[in-house]
């Protein structure tokens, strides 16, 4: 089990700032969806560094991203 970022879509859509996307060090992990005006996380790419949480919660005081625990997918043996 490990932690990944999870965006609260409705709260994020209120701000439309995209700062978390700019600060995420992992390419194509944290993206912005124009149709909902909010960020979204590609869980398989998230390394759990929490930089996005720091930017959103501590710097901007918006609290739209939190870390959630996930379990890795079971790999099938061939």
From Swiss-Prot:
Cofactor(s) demanded: [4Fe-4S] cluster
Q: How is the cofactor bound?
A: Binds 2 [4Fe-4S] clusters.
Residues where [4Fe-4S] cluster 1 binds: 12, 17, 20, 56
Domain (4Fe-4S ferredoxin-type): give its ranges: 3-35, 37-66
Q: Which residues bind [4Fe-4S] cluster 2?
A: 24, 46, 49, 52
Record's keyword terms, sorted: 4Fe-4S, Electron transport, Iron, Iron-sulfur, Metal-binding, Oxidoreductase, Repeat, Transport
EC numbers on record: 1.-.-.-
Keyword NAD in record: no
User: Per its record, what are the GO molecular function terms?
Assistant: 4 iron, 4 sulfur cluster binding; metal ion binding; oxidoreductase activity
Q: Which domain of life is it from?
A: Bacteria
Q: What class of enzyme is it?
A: oxidoreductase
Q: Tell me which InterPro entries the record gives.
A: 4Fe4S_Fe-S-bd
Q: How does it assemble?
A: Heterotetramer of one alpha, one beta, one delta and one gamma chain.
Name of the molecule in the record: Ferredoxin oxidoreductase 2 subunit ForD
Q: Which gene encodes it?
A: forD2
């Amino acid at each position: 089990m490990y932690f990944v970022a999870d965006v609260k879509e409705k709260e994020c859509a209120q701000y439309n700032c995209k700062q978390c996307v700019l600060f995420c060090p992992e390419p194509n992990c944290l993206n912005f969806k124009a149709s909902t005006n909010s960020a979204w996380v590609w869980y398989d790419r998230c390394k759990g560094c929490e930089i996005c949480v720091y930017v959103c919660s501590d710097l901007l005081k918006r609290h739209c991203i939190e870390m959630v625990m996930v379990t890795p997918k079971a790999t099938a043996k061939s």
